[in-house]
């Protein structure tokens, strides 16, 4: 298996339609003849590493209610079968000794491919990208093994009373929206492996609106042949897509309090306070939220743990989301 090439046959290379320099970051921006954009930024932080990220608008919000359970395991399942002519096990054998990784995934409002490689293994990274777009592979045996492991883990997890606490919190915050709920053992009755792979092919059937970004020890002249061979030949349909904001779980408005009791081996009380509001998504607000979290951590550590001795600690989080609109979240636990 290890002697077989990852890609037995390749189409004729595509072409770079346009090349320009980004004035802000000094990156090289390529537009390929199939519509894909490629951003190349040379850095000297690590000589043995090139990072890659690729994104396209769309994401899980483009699927309806019937696929909610499938989406819960989507990212865990899509590479179980490997790619091309290689099972996941055989693919790992082929990649043994190489510094390379490539992972497709779907987010709330994007499709993504993330990866990295040492400069010497950069061609392999491009080959993996090409395979995950053009030749995803199913493996029913691998999926059955995954399903059995997950069901056993989830049944064991659901014995933990704190899971009930977390589930209740999620239901309260998102007004019992099924898209926000975690996966349960019972969900596997509705999950379909063939449907997930069908969804995957649908989302990655059109590469024309993807932007690939490579950062690291890049030589532009050396990487261009890989771009032309493996990215400029990806399938395209010219779809103009954007995520569907109507399918994003909305945070419940107004004040809500939920107090419930559950038997524990070691009695304790857990309290979560959650606040949300509208806020513009920009760098200033992101930094402000980060500093707020750090300040609250210091204050709670001093007042609640050290002065009052009332708890082992308080955890906080503060963040801002940009989709479907600017929104801030603050949590103290």
What are these regions (language model features)?
Residues 1, 46-79, 83-135, 147-155, ...:
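M16 family metallopeptidases and their MPP-like homologs
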Residues 1-65, 211-213, 218-263, 269-271, ...:
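Proteolytic maturation boundary segments
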Residues 103-105, 138-145, 209, 237-243:
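Surface-exposed patches in mature extracellular/periplasmic domains of secreted proteins
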